[in-house]
Amino acid sequence: MSRPTRAQVAAGRVLIVGDAMLDRYWFGAVERISPEAPVPVVRVNREEERLGGAGNVALNVKSLGAQATLLTVVGDDEPARKLRGLLEREGVRAVLGSDPQLYTIVKLRVIGRSQQLIRVDFENQPDHEVLAGMLADYERLLGEHDAVLFSDYGKGGLTHIPRMIELARAAGKPVLVDPKGDDYTRYAGATVITPNRAELAQVVGQWLSLIHI
């Protein structure tokens, strides 16, 4: 199979569906230990916000030259507005559902002396299928795209993924899945599944060398 040309990649239209999040970074100087507990005191002097999760996947697709559309659900909160602004700035088309019961996922990393000191996660586990109300949007978007990429971070946004894969295959679209968890039967019908080494070991167990896979 030949590698696609740059022109072919640029002409591609990819629909990314999954768990989007906002990555926040606080950078600062560490000059002393807190008198309250044996932890460093970080004097923050710079903050950054970046696309995370499925948002970062969409950004990577865009950086390859393809057209990227992100379909996801976020909360009705300040991080959601930040996320929307970042997507707009990066040229990623965003179809964002808003769920007032959901916290937009934020991962805050505090960096001092060029190393990460702590990560704080802000999220809540939804008690309902957050993308269920967007299946009509998903079906409509299928006709406008050449492929579907599911970015599963296990945050509850892809409970309906078997149905979504079924709809994509019925529409003749290749399906790529970045998986999470140990139940890959959920991804039945996918064209390609791309676990990393740790994710694959979670499913098939540890191996000594590639010949054991």
Q: What is each of the regions a protein language model found here?
A:
Residues T5, R13-V14, L22-A147:
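Conserved N-terminal subdomain of the carbohydrate kinase-like
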Residues A66, A170-K173:
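A short helix->loop->beta-strand "cap" motif at the edges of active sites that frequently abuts
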Residues K155-E166:
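Active-site core of PLP-dependent enzymes with the aminotransferase class I/II
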Residues L200-A201:
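A generic structural signal for short hydrophobic patches within well-formed alpha-helices
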